[in-house]
């Protein structure tokens, strides 16, 4: 699995417009994209726009990049500068519930961005920790959507 995370500063008063644009324009443009597993967007607690997508593999993500850029072009006027993009292969991931693209209740997303692994540890160690410790701990937590770890840098 492959994940892409985008963070962007949004011009004052444009956050709701940016989120609506993603919901009403970007997401529907992905209906026929092969290999897309999920896409979501939110406003962060520090006022930034955040969007993420998960893919079957990097090739599926790369095959859709032109369509992605075309769909996002309309949001440029709402942004205050260039977005920051992080992407990489998932080293571990677990989804607990599904969220419908038709809408309904929103959900809360929490991302923890780190700078790699601890000295002497590998991404295999991260995957093992997630699989053996984090996933079982969250298995019966009501309302949790998913957890994961992604390798974005060496």
Predicted regions and their residues:
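Short S/T/G/P-rich N-terminal loop/turn motif that feeds into the first structured element of a domain
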Residues: 1-50, 54-154
């Amino acid at each position: 699995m492959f994940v892409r995370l985008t963070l962007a500063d949004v011009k004052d008063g444009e956050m709701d417009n940016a989120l609506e644009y993603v919901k009403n324009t970007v997401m529907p443009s992905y209906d026929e994209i092969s290999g897309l597993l999920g896409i979501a967007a939110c406003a962060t607690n520090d006022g930034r726009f955040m969007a993420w997508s998960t893919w079957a593999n990097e090739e599926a993500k790369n095959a859709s990049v032109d369509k992605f850029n075309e769909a996002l072009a309309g949001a440029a006027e709402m942004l205050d500068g260039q977005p920051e993009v992080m992407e990489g292969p998932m080293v571990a991931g677990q989804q607990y519930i599904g969220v419908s693209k038709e809408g309904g209740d929103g959900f809360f997303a929490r991302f923890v961005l780190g700078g790699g692994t601890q000295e002497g540890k590998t991404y295999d160690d991260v995957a093992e920790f997630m699989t053996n410790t984090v996933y079982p701990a969250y298995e019966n937590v009501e309302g949790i959507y998913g957890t994961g770890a992604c390798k974005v840098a060496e």
